[in-house]
């Protein structure tokens, strides 16, 4: 698994993820890029779960973005519908967080599209650790940026979760 976390603060959105890929009980690679920009650099995606499945979903999401001219919510809902109804896609084991400058969403394999109640979303095996750390930092008085909060949340997750490392990729919109 992995950890992907997304934070909105002061009008900025940051998504970050670690770089660890595991196969069974062993680390296969520590520098996988699970966070990437798409749609003319205006949308950032982060994925957790099976890497091959995530790439299939990312490709489908990019097609939806093109079809709907970058409209994040519409593209996410259409992807979730297809994921839920298309028999071959139902077996894919991955989750995604997608964000643009105004919205960010979690897209799950069961067809859920979730907008966060708070300004944090996190997925993957270390997701709950990262979400807790990010929420705590958002609720305290500090001068941390969204990027700094994501970095700290990923560090906490990496300290606790054996499937999350400290090689972070963070993108900000």
Swiss-Prot record:
Give the Gene3D superfamilies listed for this entry.
Glutamine Phosphoribosylpyrophosphate, subunit 1, domain 1
Summarize where Na(+) binds, as residue positions.
158, 161, 164
Q: Which UniProt keywords apply?
A: Allosteric enzyme, Cytoplasm, Hydrolase, Metal-binding, Protease, Sodium, Threonine protease
Phylogenetic classification of the source organism: Bacteria, Pseudomonadati, Pseudomonadota, Gammaproteobacteria, Pasteurellales
Gene name tied to this protein? hslV
- What's in the GO CC field? HslUV protease complex; proteasome core complex
Taking the first listed entry, what is the main subcellular location of this protein, grouped into a coarse class?
Answer: cytoplasm
Q: Does the keyword RNA-binding apply?
A: no
Instruction: Write down the species.
Output: Actinobacillus succinogenes (strain ATCC 55618 / DSM 22257 / CCUG 43843 / 130Z)
What reaction is this protein's catalytic activity?
Answer: ATP-dependent cleavage of peptide bonds with broad specificity
EC number(s) on file? 3.4.25.2
Catalytic residues, chain numbering: 2
Short name of any one Pfam family annotated for the protein: Proteasome
Q: Which GO terms describe its biological process?
A: proteolysis involved in protein catabolic process
Q: In what way is its activity controlled? A: Allosterically activated by HslU binding.
Location(s) in or outside the cell: Cytoplasm
- What quaternary structure, including any partners, is listed in this protein's UniProt entry? A double ring-shaped homohexamer of HslV is capped on each side by a ring-shaped HslU homohexamer. The assembly of the HslU/HslV complex is dependent on binding of ATP.
GO MF entry, a single one: threonine-type endopeptidase activity
Identify this protein by name: ATP-dependent protease subunit HslV
PROSITE patterns, sorted: PROTEASOME_BETA_2
